Amino acid sequence: CVITDELLVRRIRKKPLNGRYLEFDMPYIPVPLERERSDRRVYPRLCILCDAERPAVENQYFIQHGEDPRDVVLGILVNYMEEKGRPAGIYVRDAELFGIAGDLCAKTGVALSFSPMLKVLDFFVEDIINQFN
């Protein structure tokens, strides 16, 4: 996902580094939900950003049917950086998220890394799944 808004990039680059490390993922929640005006069940997709050190959920959002996940991911990252500064690093688990966030992170000086283990994030996702059951 290429970021073309240079004013946005400059504004974010001016934000201080906050020293935080974040975990970011877009898991499907394995609990089927009924969809309005349809007989098909859907598995909701959660976009969740966690502080890897505190541990705390910084933002979470259920992606709606038909909504572009790229817009959701970039919106969450931009909002975080504008409100709390640029994190020292962001850990993601999959190539899709890496591809969406890669250009923004590169242009704003934020390290983006793959990590198969996102312990804090997985703890919160498990808690959300348990609430559905």
Task: Please tell me what each predicted stretch does.
Residues 1-133:
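Secondary-structure boundary/capping micro-motif
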